[in-house]
Amino acid sequence: MRTLALLICLPVLAQGANPAQSLILEAKATLDSRIQAYRAHVAAGKPRADFKWDFTLQLQRINDQLAKPQPETVKHALLVAELGYRVVGRQRLEPATFEAIRASVPAASPAWAIDPALLTELAENLSDEKTAASYLAQARVQSPVAEVRAYLLEQQFEDALEAKDEATWKAALAALETQHAASKDLATARQSLEQYRKTAVGIPAPAFKLASLENPKAEFSLESFKGKWLLIDFWATWCSYCRLELPFMHQAWDRFQDKNFEILSLSFDQKPEDIAPFRRTPATPMPWKHAFVTGAKQSPLAQAYGIVGIPKPILVDPTGKIVATDGELKGKRLVVTLEKFLGK
């Protein structure tokens, strides 16, 4: 989840703020502070799992306030703040929780300025896709907060780019350019487009050389897979979206491992030792080839492949040409795409 940074003008905005605005600003500041602390923790080389997310006091205060009658705008701010603390705090939430918030907090509520990414988090956890899409569309158009509208346009751009929906991503980019020219979201969208083109379908895959994770004396390179179909999988054990893809990858491996097909998972974990314990879990053996990418997203390999986020799957044909990427290789579409090239 991408969380917005604090506005430089925060102290000015706080002056004379109404109760709902004050709650929004306070929650925004608290979440940003903890996220920055987490990033510093990771940058220092400390294990991600050792970081303590603790919003106990904030959640207790919110519960106390929600137990009393509140103006609707204050209630909206409290509910979104509560969602933010629980999501960022890595609490497991049931779908009913997201449904209840959708029913209680309008899509265009200013409270979503606490962190616009909570809107996409909510939408991803709603059971009905049409309801989720409608809720996001309403917020994207009607939110009174410019940064919320810009964020949602950028997310629409990213989703359409991954889905190769050219008409939609071009429209979203144009809206960012005309309506939010000075926003960081426009800069992010332009950067994503530039990086995306590095692995466009039809071009040769960038060359690489990496030591095998299981046998450091062995080396993987694009040349070593020549003549085979290769699914390159940029991932990490800490990446929840990567973990969600693993059942589909195991299914694909079982189906196609005997059809001149290889998978090479390239880890962005903090250290190589993080991977073996994860693979010892019965549900995630990942019985294919593995390598560790030193430097992760900042590595030359990540730059060559234009990695903006993970998971990032890329299918390379036996000649070394990229034939499919991103959404074509995720979820149930992975097997469908592989059947297209390798047969059923």
Feature roles, as predicted:
Residues 3-13:
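Sec-dependent N-terminal signal peptides
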Residues 49-62, 88-100, 124-135, 165-169:
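Helix-turn-helix repeat elements of alpha-solenoid scaffolds
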Residues 67-78, 85-95, 104-118, 125-130, ...:
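Short solvent-exposed coil/turn linkers within tandem alpha-helical repeat scaffolds
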Residues 152, 162-216, 223-226, 277-280:
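N-proximal helix/coil linker or "cap" segments that precede and/or mark the start of modular domains
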Residues 226, 234-251:
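Conserved redox-active cysteine motifs that mediate thiol-disulfide chemistry
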Residues 244-284, 294-303, 336-337:
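Structural microenvironment flanking redox-active thiols in thiol-disulfide oxidoreductases
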Residues 284-286, 293-339:
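Thiol/disulfide oxidoreductase modules built on the thioredoxin-like
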